[in-house]
Amino acid sequence: MAPGSPYSDRPYWQQAVFGLCILSLIILAPVALPYFMNPATATPQTHAPVHVKILAVNDFHGQIPPGQKLNNEPAGSAPVLASYLKAAEAGAGQAATFIALPGDVVGASPPESGLLLDEPTLLFFNGFANDCCGQAGSSCSASCNMVATFGNHEFDKGMTELVRKIHGGNGATTIIHLVDPYPGSRSSYVCSNVVWKSNGTPVVSPYVIRDAGGAKIAFIGADTIMTVSLEMPANLEDVTFLNETESVNRYVPIVQEKGVHAIVVLLHEGGMQDPYEGPTQEGCNVTGRVADIVAGLDPDVDVVLSAHTHMFTNAYLPNAGGRTVLVTQAYSYSRAFADVDLDIDPVTGDITGKTAQIVPAYADTPPGTTPDPAAAAFLAEDERVVAPLTGRVIAVAATDITGTETDSGESALGDLVADGQRAAMHADVAFVTTGSLRAEIAQGNVTWGDLYAVQPFSSTVLVMTLTGDQVRSVLEQQWQQPLPPHNLAISGLSYTYDGSRSAGSRVTGIMVGGAPLDKEKKYTAAMVDYLASGGDGYTVFTKGTNVVNGPVDVDALVTYTGSLPQPVNPPAGGRITKAG
């Protein structure tokens, strides 16, 4: 062999064998070549797909403790949900498993999480993170199994607190820290459509690319643009929300250029459909903004993990290229999760198969009957820390006081909370958005923690002056989209409405303090600061005058409920009447 050949320094017998092999190939090539060139006779090379599992938990809302139900069965809590997630992680066949959190992980939380600024919730999910999470900048970070995006409630405490929650540190907080100093979240936060006003750059990375055991997968995040009408303006003064579809599509070509074609979107926006059991079915009818957003997505988007509406979603919807997108949402408050299975071609990187199941986390069904020991111990310590405040008995409920609405849209719980805010501010009337009612009051002893769970936002109750005409206008605003109709609980007034009439003329027969509403008269109105700033689209409140701040919402409810004759009965109702 020629000098410099890699074989020239081998024994002569190896050189001879190598030469005979080359000669044999030359002689046989004309015979064998037709078989390689003829598709009919050639055996194609196949590659087994890479199987990837994603476990998506949307709208957790700090639901570490038990107390939730799904289909009238106990469901959820940190220990129960953990038992389900760990069982799914341990399943055979997947090359990689990711846990995805499509927003509202925190906010509107029960006291076990909310009183500690939702650090317990983020610490709970940190327990699922592998060793590569939290290793930003290292080669290992591409194997982190946790990814999350923002929901509207991530902004409840403003940007400074949101940044602290993600990156860690105690900041200016005065709470007890279960882990001190607070280490931050180990999830990789992604969001493509929330940018800093100062420079237009995303607040967090728009996307991440993850190794998936022989394949790569991209996660792109987006929060609902409706956040601007769902949050206090002061909480969003440093950021801008961009169109969800356009923002996601902006980054698809970028991940494609990196050779990634398996694309999953964490979207904090949702819809609704009729629930069912089992794998994803064809032909499902999904309503809501999520369908419109998906319809405009880049053809290379494969999966959308949705959230926000707290509903069931498991469907195939078309994207802008007519290709099917798997869309999921698994209720809320730790009661369920989406178990998503993907097959990825290891050569092309495309997703070749996708299906999901929405799995209820029932407490009385295995594996929920064996709560996760580590999560149970964590919850016990959390409850011990907050017990001195949450365990204080405030009142006794004669019967359940629920948020179940009558046909006219009124509930006993809404009436009670509105009465409490009106009493706190000595106002003529009070308005409460029913979306702020986050738990119900059960018969028996009512603790401070029970009432905090009803009103967990720590909003400030205030009083302002409105004209009679402005009161009427506020009631008419209940039917504007995208809000659900008649979603204001009221106190100190009553009215009749006809939802079939044209906008601006649906409300009639308004009575205040037993007398007909006088359009020219000035009335004092109580509400929380969120509504006063135009939250939920109630812009009329921004025109109120003589604003005076009062107590925090839960304090108003605690004081009022404790002052009532015991045991407390639900308010009589009859404040809202539906015509016809």
What are these regions (language model features)?
Residues 1-38:
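Secretory targeting signatures
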Residues 15-23, 36-51, 55-57, 61, ...:
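Non-catalytic terminal accessory segments
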Residues 36, 43-363, 408-420, 430, ...:
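Acidic, metal/ion-coordinating pockets
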